[in-house]
C-alpha cells in the first residue's frame, strides 16, 4: 500500500515539477512527515526524488528548445557549490532558523514578482558572476530545507534579472539537477537518505514531469505567471504555519 501511495505522490509531484520548473520538495517534505518520517529524513527523500524529475524534465525542455544551456550551467554550478554545504547547515542550524530565512526570501520574491510584468521589457541580465552568486546562495539555503531551490531562483530570474517566464521555468528546473545532486551527496554522507523510498518517488515523478513540462509549454505567459504567484503564496502560507507551530 505504501508503495502505491509513494508512486502516486511521485506522479503528482513530477507534474508540479515540470509545470512550475521546481523540484517538488515543498510537496514531498510535508507528505513524508505525514507518513511519519522525521523532517531531516523527509528532506533526504525529497532531494533524491528531485534528481529523477529534474534530469528528465530538463531533457524534455531541451528537446523542446525551452532551455538555454550556457546561463543555466553557470547558475547550476553555483547551486551545486552552495548545496554541498547543506549537510553541514542542516546539522548545525535549527529547523526554525532555516524556515525563517526561507520565509524572508519568499516574501521578497513574491512582492517583486507580483509587480513584474509577464512579458519582460529589454534584455535579460546575463552576468555570469551574478548568476553564479544567485545559484550559490539559493543552493545553500534551499537544499537545507528540502527544496530544490527553483521556487526561489525563478522569481529572482524573472523579477531581478528580467528573464522571460518560460525561459526562467526551464532554467529553474535545470538548476535543480545541480542543487539536488549536490544536496543528495551531502545528505547521504550524513546518512539522512532512505534510498528505497526515494527511488519509488523518483520513478513516479518521471511520468508526471513529462506531462507537466508539456502543459507548461502550451499555456500563456500571463497565465503561467498567475499560477506561479499562486504557488509561491501557498508555499509561503504553509511555511509560515510550520514556522509558527515549530
Give residue spans per PLM region:
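Hydrophobic alpha-helical transmembrane segments of multi-pass integral membrane proteins
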Residues: 111, 167-183
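Juxtamembrane transmembrane-helix boundary motif
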Residues: 1-15, 27, 31-35, 39, ...
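Short hydrophobic/aromatic, small-residue-rich stretches within specific transmembrane helices
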Residues: 46-50, 76, 172-176, 197-202
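Extracytoplasmic gate region of multi-pass secondary transporters
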Residues: 150-151
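Short, conserved catalytic or interaction motifs in soluble domains
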Residues: 24
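Membrane-embedded alpha-helical segments of transport systems
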Residues: 48-56, 81-82, 89, 175-182
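Small-residue hotspots at the loop-to-helix junctions and early N-terminal turns
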Residues: 39-44, 169, 173
Amino acid at each position: 500500500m505504501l508503495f502505491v501511495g509513494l508512486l502516486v505522490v511521485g506522479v503528482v509531484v513530477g507534474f508540479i515539477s515540470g509545470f512550475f520548473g521546481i523540484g517538488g520538495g515543498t510537496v514531498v517534505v510535508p507528505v513524508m512527515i505525514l507518513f511519519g518520517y522525521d523532517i531531516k529524513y523527509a528532506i533526504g527523500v525529497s532531494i533524491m526524488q528531485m534528481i529523477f524529475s529534474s534530469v528528465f524534465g530538463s531533457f524534455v525542455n531541451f528537446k523542446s528548445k525551452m532551455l538555454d544551456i550556457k546561463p543555466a550551467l553557470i547558475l547550476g554550478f553555483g547551486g551545486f557549490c552552495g548545496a554541498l554545504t547543506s549537510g553541514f547547515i542542516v546539522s548545525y542550524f535549527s529547523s526554525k532558523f532555516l524556515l525563517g530565512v526561507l520565509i524572508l526570501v519568499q516574501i521578497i520574491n513574491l512582492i517583486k514578482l507580483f509587480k513584474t510584468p509577464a512579458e519582460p521589457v529589454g534584455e535579460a541580465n546575463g552576468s555570469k558572476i551574478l548568476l553564479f552568486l544567485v545559484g550559490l546562495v539559493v543552493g545553500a539555503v534551499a537544499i537545507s530545507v528540502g527544496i530544490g531551490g527553483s521556487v526561489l531562483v525563478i522569481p529572482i530570474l524573472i523579477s531581478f534579472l528580467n528573464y522571460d517566464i518560460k525561459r526562467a521555468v526551464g532554467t529553474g528546473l535545470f538548476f535543480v539537477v545541480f542543487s539536488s545532486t549536490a544536496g543528495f551527496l551531502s545528505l547521504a554522507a550524513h546518512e539522512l537518505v532512505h534510498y528505497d523510498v526515494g527511488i519509488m518517488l523518483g520513478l513516479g515523478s518521471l511520468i508526471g514531469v513529462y506531462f507537466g513540462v508539456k502543459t507548461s509549454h502550451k499555456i500563456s505567459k500571463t497565465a503561467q505567471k498567475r499560477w506561479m504567484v499562486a504557488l509561491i503564496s501557498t508555499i509561503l502560507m504553509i511555511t509560515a504555519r510550520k514556522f509558527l507551530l515549530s
